[in-house]
Amino acid sequence: CIRDSLYTSGRIFTKQYFRYGKFEIKAKLPVTAGVWPALWFKANSGPACVGEIDLVEYIGCMKAEKMNVNVHLWGTFGGKKNNHKQYPRSVAVNISNYHIYTLEMLRGKLVFKVDGKVVYEVKKGDIEYWPFDETSYRLMIALSYGGTWAGSCGLADNSLPQSIKVDYVKYYRLKEECND
């Protein structure tokens, strides 16, 4: 659906869902007010609590040399319905340059890397609930403009259009998963 609008946002995603493995994405992302580029993983469905994995997330209020990685829990957990918790980490990297962003999805552990260096690691016991072994995830590459979060930084209409430049996306299946 295309609406009569001054701006559009977009996303592409994998058709297939993945449970375990290693993703590498070589990309450079825009850094201007009002943009919200993200490389993230959305849950297929599954338990009452589902997870979200943000490999890269940025909004224009952040400095160009900072980005966030994050793990979210959504749904019913901790005795509450419609609950949401997040476990973010700020990472020093200039996303306006090409970098290789890596997510290793392992049993009981998520490892985030930039250019081969571990920048964040979350293990099953580190957070309140662990849905990441219970369902599959698809990769989403998204670029939004405005909205409640990114728009709170102001908008830079004169810097449009913007885009995410992707050199490649690679997926490596774990050897132990090949026998399933």
Task: Show where each model-derived region lies.
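GH16 jelly-roll
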Residues: 3-180
